[in-house]
Amino acid sequence: MAADDKVVLGLIHAEDDPESVLICYLLGVEALRAGKQALMWLTKDGIKVATDGFAETVNVPNAPSIADLHAEYVEKGGRFYACPVCVKTRGMEDAVWTKGAEVKGAPSLYEFTEEYCYALAEAIG
């Protein structure tokens, strides 16, 4: 697969902003449907998204189900990288991670992107 067939989605939010979580899943699922590889790069509170069962705990009224989007994302091979520093600072070293999730830092992100990728990030703020 070519490097430009990879999409990185940055997310810093979890239950504090379910709409950002929803948007990240919508973008990721659409990328996978288009035949691209999708990776959620999770930092700050966003790492919670990669914990087992999280997707069932949040929703956005009148929007697609985050749990259903999560299931499709994982089924189609979507991946999650949880920032190791963020995992440590939140005391989540013993967390149970969802399928496709790994605690990986910047070097692994750079390896995934190789020379080029589409990068989609939620605004920080």
Which ranges hold each PLM region?
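Basic/polar N-terminal segments that are highly enriched at the extreme N-terminus
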Residues: 1-4
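Short internal beta-strands
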Residues: 38-43, 80-84
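Short, electropositive alpha-helical surface patch
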Residues: 95-102
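N-terminal beta-loop-helix "entrance" segment that forms/cooperates
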Residues: 46-60
